[in-house]
Amino acid sequence: MPVAEASPVASSEPGFVKMEDRKRAATSDHNDSAPPLKKQATSVNGGSKPHPDADMPWKDDLEVSLGLAGVVGFMSFQGGLRYPSSAEPTTSLTIKDAIWRQMQEYKREKVSLEAKLKDMSKAATRHNEHLRVIDTWYNQVCGSTLIDEVKLLLGAAEDIKGDRPTFQSSLSFDDVDNFEKHLKSRSNDIRDIISRLVKNTPKSPPEICELQSQLAKKLAEEKATIAELDKALSEKQQLEESLEEASLRYMVAEKKLDRARSLTVAKLEKQYILGPQRPGGDSASGQREEQSVSNGATPSAERGPELDEAHNKLVAISEKQKEQLQKLETENANLLSQITDLNIKRSKLTDDDYAHTDLFKQMRSQYDDVVKRINHLEATNVQLREEAVKLRSERTAYRNQVDEETQNVIAEKEAQLIRAETDLARIRNARDELLADQQMRKAAQEQEKTAVLKVQELAEARNAQIASLESEVERLRLQVENAKATQADSSDIPVEELRGKYQVLERQYAMLNTELTSMQTACKKYSTLASQKVTDFSALEEKMARLTAEKSKADQKYFAAMKSKEARDLEVRTLRMQNSKSSDIVSQLKESEAATRSLLANMEKQVSETKEALNSMMNKHHATQQQLAENGIVIEGLKGQINELKTLSTSKDATLASTSSACRQAETEIEGLKATLADTKKSLDNWKNKSLGNSSSEYEMLRTLALCTVCRRNFKNTAIKTCGHVFCKDCVEERLTSRSRKCPNCNRSFGNNDYMHITL
């Protein structure tokens, strides 16, 4: 049956024209994911080629027309679509297109919401990390020994519970409930420690305290405004991002609308949708051209909602600007009144006004006190100089006296040293004589010891000789006995006697051997004693020669010592005379030394007292100078702070003005965007109501088309590459597992890699 074209019908009503625009086929968007076309599915196997005009400027129009044709052809090919009448396909395509556009809108909203959720999750994690870092820092600081040491240095907590001084908060966020709740558990410890620190700090003048309080208030206000500004800037940035996204979507939609209204797109749609199957194509194409031309023209009635939307936006912006202008006028009036008051006060300031201030009075009293102290210090300085001159003269006289006494003492000590040297020489001579006598006695004792040893050796030799002589006597006695026995007849001697004689001869032989050994030892001892005597006599001769030489030297030393002794005796006599004279001088010097020591003790006491007084005066002088320097530094610092605060106030006023202008501009933009958002929401609700009015039957028909033709249970989501038919994934996998790998519609075989997932 012939298929009716999907081109919109021209109408003078703006709502009907927009409804027809919504029923246009969805174009391919780079940001949206379009369903896979049959051409794309078959191009995987290499069965199709790119369009020859793909690189031309009108490729977007080709994509639109090809997308429509592909969707319709694919749906008709896979499901065997047959239309009973010409009205049904137009309605089904329109509903499909509307559903598709709604799905794309949902996808875009989903993407934007996911992006916002991602940003919010990042911000939440960052804030959680900041809070975690703050908690860990507090736990580390309050749990460490540093705070304990500070508490010990500050003293016990009971001492300061009575009068606890208040301290200025650098934040002053007393009106923020969340901040108070977050720090409620930690506020007691923080306030306790900070109040104790503030109490132990030195008290400053009331002017400085007032300036500090004003500075703290200004800083708190500045931080509050900065926080509000950051909040407004973040909201502005979010609104700008949403505005950019909305404008981008609006531009894309406008571009799609222009493409859908073009005559070329209508012709291509007619060519690809109807094709050669439609015999009455000329009349339809003529009607399509007329309708597209009528759609291309913009009637006057279509401008109504756009003008209303712009009018509402401008009205909201103007109302917001009026409110802002009224606020600015009131603020300017208040500021002008304050400026005039301040100018009047500043122009009327005189010297009396400055003189009546507390700061001037304090500085005046400090100046008078410093002048009095300086005059007193000058008078004491003159007295101390005079006393120093007197002490110097006394010190020079005492130094001269001490020098004379030391010279006399040195001369006396030198005389004593000379006497000690003479005594030392005499003692050394006596020591040498004693050492020589000792050596002589030692040599005599050694000679006596050697003589005794030699006598003992001779006695041992004599004993050995006696033993040898005794053995000789025994031998001779035995010989005499043998001689007597041999006088008898030897033939008559029996064997036993011969044996006894033999034994006697053996004993005689042994005795001869012992006699020979004793004689050998005696001869050896005699020879050793003789050689030792010869060496001893030679050593004695050498010793005698050495002793004679030493004796001659000792005689010479003795004569020299005697001469020096006579000279020393003369010196001793003279020194004794001098000693008797110097004893009187020493007694006099001791008396004068005692007097000088008492005088020196008195002078040292006076010097120590004057030094203490001088040190105290110098310390006071340094303290006053330091106090003056500190006061000057404090004054300069306060002047610098005043100048800095002035410059800071001017810069903050400029930044506040710029930020307020930026906030006003952002508020106007927000109001305009809110108005446009309300209008777009209204138009969206209107179009939703129009599009979803009578779509129950078409929805059921589309649902039956989207169901699988085999199981009638699941939706079609898997396409077979070899033939292009679409079934559900369960049916395809069931065919693969049962090894009946053929298409249910055309019985064409397919393998494990011959099917793909699609999205309708």
Curated annotation (Swiss-Prot):
Catalysed reactions listed for this entry: S-ubiquitinyl-[E2 ubiquitin-conjugating enzyme]-L-cysteine + [acceptor protein]-L-lysine = [E2 ubiquitin-conjugating enzyme]-L-cysteine + N(6)-ubiquitinyl-[acceptor protein]-L-lysine
Subcellular location: Nucleus
Disulfide linkage: none
EC nos: 2.3.2.27
Organism: Aspergillus oryzae (strain ATCC 42149 / RIB 40)
SUPFAM superfamilies associated with the record: RING/U-box
Keyword Coiled coil listed: yes
Swiss-Prot/TrEMBL GO biological process terms: chromatin organization; protein ubiquitination
Keywords: Chromatin regulator, Coiled coil, Metal-binding, Nucleus, Transferase, Ubl conjugation pathway, Zinc, Zinc-finger
Function, in words: E3 ubiquitin-protein ligase that mediates monoubiquitination of histone H2B to form H2BK123ub1. H2BK123ub1 gives a specific tag for epigenetic transcriptional activation and is also a prerequisite for H3K4me and H3K79me formation.
Domain of life: Eukaryota
Pathway info: Protein modification; protein ubiquitination
One GO MF term attached to the UniProt entry: zinc ion binding
Keyword Oxidoreductase: no
Pfam family, one: BRE1
Principal cellular location given in the protein's record: nucleus
Compositionally biased spans, kind Basic and acidic residues: 18-32
Zinc finger feature spans (RING-type): 708-747
CC terms in the record's Gene Ontology section: HULC complex; nucleus
Protein name as catalogued: E3 ubiquitin-protein ligase bre1
Protein family (similarity comment): Belongs to the BRE1 family.
Residues covered by region (Disordered): 1-58, 274-306
Residue ranges of coiled coil: 210-263, 309-561, 594-691
